From Swiss-Prot:
Belongs to the UPF0045 family. It holds the Pfam family Thiamine_BP. This is UPF0045 protein ECM15. The gene is ECM15. PANTHER family: UPF0045 PROTEIN ECM15.
């Protein structure tokens, strides 16, 4: 198993539903994410998930399987991910660095 620390920003959307609203779906997916032991931060256009590469990718696969179990035929997922090997950095660390630089401006 890879221990490579990963930050993934993910947005999952079911396609072909009868309603343009996806809040019920997002609620179910977010509940599953929070039930995992991985750190996550929900935001207005998705969720950032942090942890070891294999565990994060496994969770994303589980979320897809769960989505299909819920009866959704097609799921569109967009991901942005990052890794680094020189140090472990959380999503909040990245925000804090920029906020500090802004305050020093």
């Amino acid at each position: 198993m890879s221990k490579l620390h990963t930050l993934v920003d993910i947005c999952m959307v079911p396609l072909g539903t009868s309603s343009p609203s996806v809040s019920d779906y997002v609620t179910k997916i977010e509940k599953r994410i929070r039930e995992s032991h991985l750190k996550s931060t929900m935001h207005s256009f998705g969720t950032t998930i942090e942890g070891p590469w294999d565990e994060v990718m496994s969770l994303i696969g589980q979320l897809h399987e769960y989505s299909h179990e819920l009866g959704y035929v097609r799921i569109h997922t967009e991901m942005r991910l990052g890794t680094r090997t020189d140090k472990q950095q959380t999503a909040q660390d990245k925000v804090d660095v920029v906020e500090k630089k802004l305050s020093d401006y």
